């Protein structure tokens, strides 16, 4: 892994060597840049220079934290049709195979999805559906504490999904992709100028496949519509509609196995990653519907107020089951022998086609409604002899979530047991009637929150800026838990809990920008997240204060003299210093845990020559440790610690090395070739002493343009060595990464 990181660093130093000497003019470049109708989109380059992840439109060089941008061009080059796959193209991202079947995203080893750190156009995006890239212009990954901008959140950072917006041009594109596993994907992107300052944009998608390369079928469709009026004028309005339907299969996971009899280590099963052992009746349905609007009022070229409102409806209906090696055991309560036909242990020495597997029952059925409002002001002015870039804003939100459970036969429902299967008979077509389940409300959660923030970037000297920001958040949550008697259909009893949290989130930093090509920063920020985000409220945690975290970073953003190549470097330390633990003596949650990570990151993105383009992202995380967890109980039996982590361990899902490299070369005006690597070092799921092996996968791309660039044919070969690796980890199982896939895309522009 280290040579790849060294290659990125060497490329960046080469670009730095091209940096021109400082100009005589001392004025720094404008921080807030207004969008122009002809501004390039993410599909035009791998390199991005601006972002709105800092609320106002800003140059990346003026944000005192690390930001990685995955543009639409990179998404298209590598045929990344899900947000999860796109995020794998940034260093430090890993995935937990969560109990609910969703992708629990980790950044620098800290959870993002569980703490609500995914956003669409700067507004929070609930974590109960599987996201697609068909309407994305780019993904922005802010690394480190993000609470100053977004409120409650994690230590690792935040991910902002930037939607495609209408432009003042008539331009359309239709793509058709065919691949192995009967993969078919069609997308359309239609931009229509409807007036001097108005435009309409429509995006649509449909995707089907028998297998996504890692055991799950695909059947999804989506549509998005955006209309803008007053583009570039004093008052600009936009209306957005978005809908996505997923009717996919689900590979809930495959168990690990001991390499030898009696070994405490675990390895991956030697199986084709596309192998499926779940029931044919398992499925993973989810949907998202968003309706929103925005108004931007420009007081001047350097001052604007942007107000957004959005309502959303989300649903998830997942019927699946964990696959386990069938093992003989004893029921601790009754003494009865379970699975008497199966061995008491498994290893690769005894593994074969007749090894028996059990299928579990895991339901995740929920719906969620959201309403959000936010208003953000950004402006430039001079005061006290200094230039200021000022940001301020307020936001309000309401979330309502209902989670359902199935009644057992003793409660007036049905008991469904899935048949076992054998290693040698995957895809056996086993079926159970999921429609016969009788559902009831299990819990309901309603939350209202509001926040306000201010930030000022003051230029205290020609090359120096200081950044100071502060945010206040108030969150109120009401949680109702419903239960039935163990052996009766009623009555339904309820317990109610209430949470109220008020927190301040500060951020401070210093920027040193001696030339337009160089920007160095030092920053410190604090974040928090509540019990209502990461856990369901209940008697054990209703009175638990928020977790708090701190991030310290020293970094640089460097551009080549021709501004075609950019490098980002950073060293950082992130600490969660009061992490939740379950008290070993009482059924309550306490803030007794602590963990920290420290490392180095480098991104190198842009054009090395007019024909050679590169995107690289690498993280080295040599320091990662669980410092403190729950104390031992009075019984003397020591707990396993915070969220299952054990003191002294390296936290789960924190590989020492991770990253990606992608490069393309324009050999002729019509022919472009590309190649890339994705890699992750060895890592562990929670509560285990063994590690999952590291992996490197390689991808190839070839693109040929016909008919004056109107028609393009592109072929992608991913995981060319058909590498077996664990993509998402859990203590009892893993979800394999996709095996070798071949996809061919025809694109027509008109």
Which role does the model predict for each range below?
Residues 291-313, 357-482:
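Face-selective signature of the C-terminal outer-membrane beta-barrel domain
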Residues 366, 390, 552, 649-750:
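Conserved C-terminal beta-signal and adjacent last beta-strands/turns
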Residues 228, 368, 387-391, 395-399, ...:
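Structural signature of Gram-negative outer-membrane beta-barrels, strongest in the C-terminal barrel
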Residues 28-169, 554, 731:
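Acidic, small-polar-rich N-terminal luminal/periplasmic segments of exported/outer-membrane proteins
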Residues 296-298, 304-310, 314-322, 513, ...:
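Membrane-embedded beta-barrel scaffold of Gram-negative outer-membrane proteins
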Residues 573-575, 591-687, 721-724, 745-749:
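Gram-negative outer-membrane beta-barrel transporters
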Residues 207-211, 224-230, 234-298, 313-368, ...:
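Acidic/polar loop-and-plug regions of large Gram-negative outer-membrane beta-barrel proteins
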Residues 134-137, 148-225, 229-236, 289, ...:
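Outer-membrane beta-barrel translocator/receptor signature
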């Amino acid at each position: 892994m280290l040579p790849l990181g060294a290659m990125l660093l060497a490329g960046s130093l080469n670009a730095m060597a091209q940096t021109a000497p400082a100009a005589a003019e001392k004025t720094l470049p404008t921080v807030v840049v207004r969008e122009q109708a002809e501004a390039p989109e993410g599909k035009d380059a791998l390199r991005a220079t601006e972002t709105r992840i800092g609320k106002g439109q800003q140059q990346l060089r003026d944000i005192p934290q690390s930001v990685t941008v995955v543009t639409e061009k990179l998404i298209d080059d590598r045929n990344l049709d899900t947000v999860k796959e796109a995020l794998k193209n940034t260093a430090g991202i890993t995935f937990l195979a969560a109990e609910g079947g969703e992708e629990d995203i980790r950044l620098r080893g800290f959870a993002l999805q569980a703490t609500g750190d995914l956003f669409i156009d700067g507004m929070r995006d609930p974590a109960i559906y599987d996201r697609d890239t068909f309407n994305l212009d780019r993904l922005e990954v802010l690394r480190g504490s993000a609470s100053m901008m977004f409120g409650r959140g994690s230590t690792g950072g935040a991910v902002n999904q930037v939607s495609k917006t209408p432009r003042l041009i008539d331009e359309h594109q239709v793509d058709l992709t065919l691949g192995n596993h009967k993969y078919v994907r069609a997308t359309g992107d239609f931009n229509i100028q409807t007036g001097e300052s108005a435009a309409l944009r429509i995006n649509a998608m449909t995707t089907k496949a028998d297998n996504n390369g890692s055991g799950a079928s695909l059947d999804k469709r989506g549509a998005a519509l955006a209309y803008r009026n007053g583009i570039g004028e004093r008052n600009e309005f936009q209306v957005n509609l978005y809908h996505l339907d997923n009717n996919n299969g689900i590979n809930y996971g495959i168990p690990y196995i001991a390499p030898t009899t009696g070994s405490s280590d675990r390895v991956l099963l030697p199986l084709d990653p596309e192998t499926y052992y779940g029931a044919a009746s398992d499925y993973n349905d989810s949907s998202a519907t968003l309706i929103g609007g925005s108004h931007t009022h420009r007081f001047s070229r350097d001052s604007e107020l942007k107000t957004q409102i959005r309502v959303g409806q989300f649903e998830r209906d997942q019927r699946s089951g964990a696959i386990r090696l069938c093992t003989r055991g004893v029921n601790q309560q009754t003494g009865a022998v379970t699975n008497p036909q199966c061995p008491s242990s498994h290893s690769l020495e005894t593994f074969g086609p007749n090894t028996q597997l059990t299928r579990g029952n895991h339901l995740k059925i929920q719906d969620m409604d959201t309403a959000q409002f936010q208003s953000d002001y950004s402006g430039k002015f001079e005061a006290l002899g200094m230039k200021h870039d000022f940001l301020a804003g307020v936001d309000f939100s309401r979330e309502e979530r209902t989670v359902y459970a199935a009644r057992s036969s003793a409660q007036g429902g049905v008991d469904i047991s899935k048949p076992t299967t054998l290693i040698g008979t995957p895809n056996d077509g086993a079926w159970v009637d999921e429609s016969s389940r009788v559902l009831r409300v299990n819990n309901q959660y309603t939350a209202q929150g509001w926040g306000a923030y201010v930030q000022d970037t003051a230029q205290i000297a020609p090359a120096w800026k200081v950044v100071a920001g502060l945010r206040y958040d108030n969150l109120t949550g009401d949680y109702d838990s419903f239960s039935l008697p163990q052996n009766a259909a009623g009555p339904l009893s309820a317990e109610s809990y209430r949470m109220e949290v008020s927190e301040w989130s500060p951020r401070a930093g210093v920027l040193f920008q001696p030339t337009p090509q160089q920007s160095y920063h030092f920053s410190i920020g604090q974040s928090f997240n509540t019990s209502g985000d990461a856990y369901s409220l209940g008697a054990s945690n209703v009175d638990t204060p928020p977790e708090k975290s701190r991030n310290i970073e020293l970094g640089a953003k460097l551009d080549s003299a021709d501004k075609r190549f950019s490098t980002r470097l950073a060293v950082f330390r992130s600490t969660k210093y009061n992490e939740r633990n379950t008290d070993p003596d009482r059924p309550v949650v306490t803030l007794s845990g602590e963990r920290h990570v420290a490392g180095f990151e480098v991104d190198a993105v842009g054009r090395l020559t007019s024909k050679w383009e590169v995107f690289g992202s690498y993280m080295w995380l040599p320091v990662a440790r669980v410092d403190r967890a729950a104390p031992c109980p009075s019984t003397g039996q020591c707990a396993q610690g915070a969220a299952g982590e054990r003191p002294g361990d390296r936290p789960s899902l924190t590989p020492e090395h991770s990253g990606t490299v992608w490069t393309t070369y324009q050999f002729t005006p019509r022919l472009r070739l590309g190649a890339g690597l994705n890699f992750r070092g060895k890592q562990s799921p929670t509560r285990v002493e063994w590690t999952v092996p590291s992996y490197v996968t390689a991808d190839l791309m070839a693109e040929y343009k016909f008919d004056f660039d109107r028609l393009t044919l592109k072929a992608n070969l991913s995981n060319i060595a058909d590498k077996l690796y664990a993509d998402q980890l859990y203590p009892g199982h893993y979800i394999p990464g996709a095996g070798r896939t071949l996809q061919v895309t025809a694109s027509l522009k008109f």
